[in-house]
Amino acid sequence: MDQNALKALVGQEAVKYVEDGMILGIGTGSTVRYMIDALGERVKNEGLHIIGVATSDRSAKQAESLGITIKELDEVDHLDLTIDGADEIDDNFQGIKGGGAAHLWEKIVAINSTKNMWIVDESKMVHHLGAFPLPLEVIPFGSSHVLEKLNKMGFNPSFRMTDTGEHVLTDSKNYIIDLHLGRIDHPHDLANTLNGIVGVVEHGLFLDTVNTVIVGRQDGPEVLNARD
């Protein structure tokens, strides 16, 4: 199976965990798109009744186009389960997210969810975080000074730009700075450091967050229990 087939596989597996009446956090990214399609099929074919809370405008639009009811996070009092993707997951089930420039909303939804599930193809499972650039969402005001501070700290930062040379904008109209670190040996320490930098709204380290990981492998989906 190619990578897209593996993504479709885990998307279909993940929606088996969605129960009637759930308030579901809906993530963002290429793998989640397959999950939303599979969820739409259950809504259509089984009459599944759920409320979705999306982590990006594009996920909300896709879900609504398939008949899934979407509400804002502030309109619900809890989330039963959030299903999202990840860019890297290490041996301790710590993750990097934000390749789709949605990690701020993703993290807000995740921390308000009773359970979190990540769905990935096998290429996302790594021994150490850091080969994938670590995204930071930063406010535009003073962002060049934030970039310079990060550079002086040795984090090898760069603004994420579009093909036309414009800043990539998040749904909150902020910029993305990617840190090209190579390897992250102490993710909790790094998270604390980044949390202390004025102008950084949120980083893409998702630590001690996920409960279940579904990995798309050539011989089928593998379900991993990360934490209770």
UniProtKB/Swiss-Prot annotation:
Substrate binds at T28, G29, S30, T31, D84, G85, A86, D87, K97, G98, G99, G100, K124. It is an enzyme of class 5 (isomerase). Pfam families: Rib_5-P_isom_A. Pathway: Carbohydrate degradation; pentose phosphate pathway; D-ribose 5-phosphate from D-ribulose 5-phosphate (non-oxidative stage): step 1/1. Its EC number is 5.3.1.6. GO terms for biological process: D-ribose metabolic process; pentose-phosphate shunt, non-oxidative branch. It catalyses: aldehydo-D-ribose 5-phosphate = D-ribulose 5-phosphate. It comes from the Bacteria. Keywords: Isomerase. InterPro entries: NagB/RpiA_transferase-like (IPR037171), Ribose5P_isomerase_typA_subgr (IPR020672), Ribose5P_isomerase_type_A (IPR004788). GO terms for molecular function: ribose-5-phosphate isomerase activity. The keyword Isomerase applies. One of its GO terms (cellular component) is cytosol. The active site is at E106. Homodimer. Catalyzes the reversible conversion of ribose-5-phosphate to ribulose 5-phosphate. Belongs to the ribose 5-phosphate isomerase family. This is Ribose-5-phosphate isomerase A.
